[in-house]
Amino acid sequence: FILKVYKKDQRYLLIKNTKFNFLKNLSIFPMKELSNPKNFNENLNFKMSNMNMNIKIQYSKDSQKFPFSYWLDKKKLNSYMLPSFTKKVVQYLEEN
């Protein structure tokens, strides 16, 4: 998977997941699944249910218009109802 990170000030762009069967209708970072990755150096590796997710993080400057999107303030992370997947990604981004 390619995970696209859009950051403005101290906020991250999240979208409502309507694309993937996992974490359906929950807030995640914009992602794209790669069918046959070549030379893929992952940043993160998650195990979710019966799925192994290798994730490459891609930082983007220009924020596109995404349907059902909002900006998450990292300082108020605990006040949002988010899947642990999204929280782990934010934690990784803050540490690296």
Please tell me what each predicted stretch does:
Residues F1-N96:
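Intrinsically disordered, low-complexity, charged terminal extensions of DNA damage-control enzymes
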